[in-house]
């Protein structure tokens, strides 16, 4: 199993996520752990964070599990991408979890902390992991604050003997285009009230992504957002499926739509299927056609985003992107 496969742009981890037909596994929170175990995990996490702040990927590689160390380009790219955010950053440990995956499971769920009659509480969490190799893992969640802002720095560690080795790393800013989860949540509610369900769904999704340090983690906060957005997902959005977008004589298959910071702006990213992007002139024309069609079909998008980035995407993942400001899409 390749422990350097990317699930999200900054996630290099050998763990996929999904709750289908899952079996419950054993999980302990920081307060459940004895002092020696908690201190060992915390010390390992802080030591790895220190290496990352210095850009010392060579040392990080030396203390990684073999599968990750054998293909370390993802970790190197993540650390390089966030070097300005991490330089001079001071870290605070926000959470430590011990996940006992000694029994292999194709769909494992780790329930951590105390749950109430209605489900999650302020101190609980659930982790959804697919095809997790047998072993004992820990998750260390760090808040890294620097002059650049707040960064969420999350480490997956795997126990080897008495040592805790790096098995995965997820680093992301706590803000997108200068806005945090609360801002996106407030805007989502506003769009929902106005009946702009496409904007509402996109902003609810961004709020949920920002509030969780890793995408395979559920908390009381993420559950509340999911409850709010339940039932408003438009059927014509490419969520877990492709969606046809007619554009003149052509029909494009949309793969995904999501918000993303481009410079200081909040833009909409639209990915669609393309057989070949080597002809960049043709790919550019297709991108422009997609942007015109998407804004014509969903005019509400002009209220929410500064621009659109269309990405023609081959089956291999190679893509070609074009950015246009909303005012230039006519």
Regions found by a protein language model. Give the residues of each.
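Short beta-strand edge/turn micro-motifs at domain boundaries
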Residues: 137-179, 259-282, 292-327
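Alpha-helical segment of the N-proximal tetratricopeptide repeat
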Residues: 50, 179-199
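Short, low-complexity N-terminal intrinsically disordered segments enriched in polar/charged residues
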Residues: 22-54, 170-183
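Acidic/histidine-rich, surface-exposed loop or edge segments in extracytoplasmic proteins
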Residues: 26-31, 43-45, 62-65, 264-278
């Amino acid at each position: 199993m390749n422990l350097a496969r990317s699930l999200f742009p900054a996630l290099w981890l050998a763990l996929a996520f999904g709750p289908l037909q899952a079996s419950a596994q054993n999980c302990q929170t920081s307060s459940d752990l004895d002092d020696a175990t908690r201190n060992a995990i915390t010390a390992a996490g802080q030591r790895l964070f220190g290496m990352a702040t210095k850009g010392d990927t060579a040392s990080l590689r030396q203390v990684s599990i073999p599968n990750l160390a054998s293909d370390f380009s993802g970790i190197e790219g993540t650390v390089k991408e966030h070097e300005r955010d991490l330089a001079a950053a001071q870290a605070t440990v926000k959470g430590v979890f011990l996940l006992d995956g000694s029994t292999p499971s194709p769909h494992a769920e780790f329930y951590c902390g105390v749950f109430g009659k209605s489900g999650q509480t302020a101190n609980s969490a659930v982790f959804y992991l697919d095809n997790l190799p047998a072993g004992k893992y820990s998750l260390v969640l760090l808040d890294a604050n620097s002059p650049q802002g707040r960064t969420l720095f999350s480490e997956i560690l795997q126990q080897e003997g008495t040592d805790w080795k790096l098995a995965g790393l997820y680093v992301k800013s706590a803000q997108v285009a200068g806005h945090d989860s609360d801002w996106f949540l407030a805007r989502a509610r506003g769009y929902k009230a106005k009946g702009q369900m496409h904007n509402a769904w996109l902003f609810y999704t961004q709020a949920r992504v920002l509030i969780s340090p890793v995408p395979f983690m559920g908390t009381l906060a993420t559950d509340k957002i999911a409850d709010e957005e339940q039932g408003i997902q438009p059927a014509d959005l490419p969520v877990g499926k492709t969606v046809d977008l007619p554009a003149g004589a052509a029909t494009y298959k949309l793969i995904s739509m999501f918000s993303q910071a481009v410079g200081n702006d909040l833009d909409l990213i639209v990915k669609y299927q393309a057989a070949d992007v080597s002809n960049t002139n043709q790919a550019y024309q297709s991108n422009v056609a997609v942007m015109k069609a998407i804004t014509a079909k969903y005019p509400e998008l002009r209220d929410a985003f500064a621009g659109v980035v269309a990405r023609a995407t081959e089956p291999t993942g190679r893509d070609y992107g074009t950015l246009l400001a909303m005012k230039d899409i006519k």
